[in-house]
Amino acid sequence: MISASRAAARLPLLLPRGGPVPAVPGLAQTFWNGLSQNVLRAASSRKYASEAIKGAVIGIDLGTTNSCVAVMEGKQAKVLENSEGARTTPSVVAFTADGERLVGMPAKRQAVTNPHNTFYATKRLIGRRFDDSEVKKDIKNVPFKIVRASNGDAWVEAHGKLYSPSQIGAFVLMKMKETAENYLGHPAKNAVITVPAYFNDSQRQATKDAGQISGLNVLRVINEPTAAALAYGLDKSEDKIIAVYDLGGGTFDISILEIQKGVFEVKSTNGDTFLGGEDFDQALLQYIVKEFKRETSVDLTKDNMALQRVREASEKAKCELSSSVQTDINLPYLTMDASGPKHLNMKLSRSQFEGIVADLIKRTVAPCQKAMQDAEVSKSDIGEVILVGGMTRMPKVQQTVQDLFGRAPSKAVNPDEAVAIGAAIQGGVLAGDVTDVLLLDVTPLSLGIETLGGVFTKLINRNTTIPTKKSQVFSTAADGQTQVEIKVCQGEREMASDNKLLGQFTLVGIPPAPRGVPQIEVTFDIDANGIVHVSAKDKGTGREQQIVIQSSGGLSKDEIENMVKNAEKYAEEDRRRKERVEAVNLAEGIIHDTESKMEEFKDQLPADECNKLKEEIAKMRELLARKDTETGENIRQAATSLQQASLKLFEMAYKKMASERESSGSSGDQKEEKQ
């Protein structure tokens, strides 16, 4: 039987302690009853001085739907084109049946025929638990498999292999890294990566993990609206308050900032991490499926390939309706039943689409109002409204923003590229290339711990400028308690259980004493990335315990290291595959050129030498027939050998032709002399 004191020793709840007071056992209850609220606080804020970074710092917008990379060139940020010539890259990763990994547009193109192994919008899963309500909603809407990982997080599965959302993000980041390296002409190691402003600590940590897995040194994680504000305000001299309305592919953020002589100070931020273009696509998809069933009695939800075609058509129609008042959705041979093939032909007007997504647009209103309230500004105080994210191209969204803020939004920044540009500018600041900019961001959600009765006691309130550090002294909740469990939460609800549990740790070795006597100082330290560090110290013994908060799931150090190795292995496989393809292209080109020249100069070439060369070509073709099992180096060597042999033969032909020309020329001269 566990004694009362031993049972009490495992109580996880702390009692907020008043101070400084004599250590009288009965006094603790007095404080708990609320007769004194002078909670001992030691709060301090510090600036993080970063040393100048060597080499280029790339800025990456790791988006839900599309990603973008930029670098500083002098005082200007430049958005880079990928290998397909596009300035944005779809955040899509696919695994083919033979194990090849595709990223970006090649992955998106084959989604219809490979829906179960093509991952998109996985940013919405990053840092989330499998049991989260948002994840449950996503499971119903996506064709790929979302599974529970051993740590309770939401992961995805392809061909029987499990991948964390951080890994999928890392594959996209590797593509961004490669794009930057192709432009710069040298390796790119350092990066600034953006996250939605309303991301919690788990999601920020998981994004940083993605950077690490991709081989990047993530110098800073900054908020997307803040990055967009940097892109907007870098060359602006006037002081003003601006609002950044960021409705992207998967998330919505609203931030209120004050720009003053190069200082960008975030006054407040709000948002919804599960609201974006993907939801607009899904709403239209459901409408189309419903209409198709009404007209044909065929339920498309049972056909993943047909659904993927409808999903792509929905995205295309959504984009077209931003510039047209009506669009046609035509999908021939979408499915079939006993009566034959079924085609989808539908006209969709802009007003119809606006009706379908009206509730989604309406969901952006309350966060905007809350952000203004928290920043203590009215709409008349806001000098400019910046639109960020592809969904802000929708006229109805622009009208909603105008109604909200009482002014037409600015078109000063490219909504697809502003965030990456801002990230590159912040990279320039860290590298010492941009010196006249200071960024003061905020933490989006309140942070605190669970205390007696399951109450959420806040140490750092939302919209506090970061980096910041705050401390508060607590005490034990039971007599003889020798250890306390610190549960760290993030959110705005009064009860700890209603907020996000970021992590927990235990401080042990507290000398037994009556409840309320020990003094336990809990310190929260938020770094410039918005990532939380927590420590607890028994002031009596000096014993301390500290952690960098990871979610109660999250990736362990070993898991991250394994994923880094896997990413490197994939990079090596990609390099070998590319090397092989280039060698095959070279070989096929040499075969084509050789055969063309042999036909052209057949009269000048010795028959036996021609036959030898034909044998070489036949051997080369045999090698190419088994190209999938050959190395690029072997194919290249064989191709080079064939090229050398053909050059020797054609050299003989040229010499023969030259001597024939000379002899015909000299015989002509002799004829002239005789005349």
From Swiss-Prot:
The keyword Cell membrane does not apply. Its EC number is 3.6.4.10. Residues 444-675 are annotated as: Substrate-binding domain (SBD). Residues 1-48 form a transit peptide. The chaperone activity is regulated by ATP-induced allosteric coupling of the nucleotide-binding (NBD) and substrate-binding (SBD) domains. ATP binding in the NBD leads to a conformational change in the NBD, which is transferred through the interdomain linker (IDL) to the substrate-binding domain (SBD). This elicits a reduced substrate affinity and a faster substrate exchange rate. Upon hydrolysis of ATP to ADP, the protein undergoes a conformational change that increases its affinity for substrate proteins. Pfam families: HSP70. ADP binds at residues 65-66, 315, 318, 322, 390, 393. Keywords: ATP-binding, Chaperone, Cytoplasm, Hydrolase, Mitochondrion, Nucleotide-binding, Nucleus, Transit peptide. Residues 434-443 are annotated as: Interdomain linker. PANTHER family: HEAT SHOCK PROTEIN 70KDA (PTHR19375). This is Stress-70 protein, mitochondrial. It comes from Gallus gallus (Chicken). The gene is HSPA9.
